[in-house]
Amino acid sequence: MENKIYGCIDLKSFYASVECAERGLDPFKTNLVVADPSRGSGGICLAISPAMKNLGIKNRCRLFEIPKNVKYITALPRMKKYMEYSANIYSIYLKYMSKEDIYIYSIDECFFDFTPYLSSYGKTPREFAVMLMEAVMKNTGVCATAGIGTNLFLAKVALDITAKHISDNIGFLDENEFKKTIWHHRPITDIWNIGKGIAKRLEKYGVQDLYGVAHMDESILYKEFGANAEFLIDHSKGYEPCTIKEIHDYKPKTESISNGQILFNDYSFDDALIVLYEMVDQLVLELTQRKSKTDSISLYVRYSKECTASTGGTRKLNFRSSSYSKISAEFEKLYRETTKKNYPIRQINVGLNHIEEDEFQQLDLFGKVDDDKEIKAQKGIIEIKNKFGKNAVLRCSSLQDKATARIRNKLVGGHNGEL
């Protein structure tokens, strides 16, 4: 079996680095925050420059948490600009590698299969990573960090943990080095894919690091985590069989689409229903554009300052459709049945599950005629929005004071999208 070498490259403080590059500033010498001041002092900083990180300020802090004596530039988020930079950086990678050997993990992070290129370029894994990082820096002004490993998991952990303690910001891990340096690392939540929930469940058994996981009775892990225990067991030993090729080849049995938003302020039961309709409308148009239908919906509602437990649920529909009127009616039923009326609402997530292409459908002559008319209208709306912008056509409910669609249509990822 071929010995594999993988890389994982992260664009350092990406949004902040882009804003510094656009201003001709050095992110390592400039205090810069990417945030929207109009959201108040509690607004989250999407990124801070490396210079501010060196002052001990946390990356995802809120504006009021930045020490008063620290002077800094505030840059309004420009999501389209960051996407433009990300696409440009991906094109730089493609000058050195085939797209089949690259997996885009996020807007600022990619995995690579270095294996076929090391002999071709006559470079070590570290030298190859440096070549890519220097090309990005030269062409965009954005600095990067990297992790190198003998599998994808080790490359990611080398990036997230090991690289932070190396002068050239490039970490390396094989299974032996992993056991020496990562097995006893704490907190365990620093490890990729281990969140606070998993950590809390492991703590019940006195386990606080991957060494503890590796030496647990596997039957206990399977009882606690089900099928997901396999990932924990493999990763606790530094093992990951999945390859980039397998990721590219993977086709899920069923697909789903979702939409979520954190509201700018507390919403009443009735006002939140307006937003729910808007979010369902957006999902249904996406469903129509995919030429697909759904037979399952899901809803999640979180209340202000966690004053009460979140609510929601998943519902199987007795029909498969992409009709807004049918799907929105089912969402309203689910909302009214599960949502607490007397608590302020701060977050809503909606989802359409079991999405399949509209190849076969049960015969329902009268229902189909009505559906066809509505789908035709939805396709017309999509064409108008694509040509004239998302706000060119809105439902009447989106003109109400508590509606958010008009504002959110100008955003990308919930933030300002302008260049």
Label each residue range with its predicted role:
Residues 105-109, 149-152, 292-296, 343-347:
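Short Gly/Ser/Thr- and Asp/Glu-enriched loop/turn motifs at secondary-structure junctions
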Residues 18, 313, 317-419:
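Acidic, metal-coordinating catalytic segment for phosphate/diphosphate chemistry
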Residues 124-189, 349, 359:
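Long, highly charged, low-complexity intrinsically disordered interaction regions
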Residues 112-133, 206:
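Catalytic palm subdomain of template-directed nucleic-acid polymerases
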Residues 1-107, 111, 236:
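Residues that scaffold, gate, or flank divalent-cation-dependent active/transport sites
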Residues 8, 200-344:
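DNA-contacting surface of Y-family translesion DNA polymerases
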Residues 18-20, 44-47, 154-162, 204, ...:
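Short acidic, glycine/serine/threonine-rich loops at helix termini
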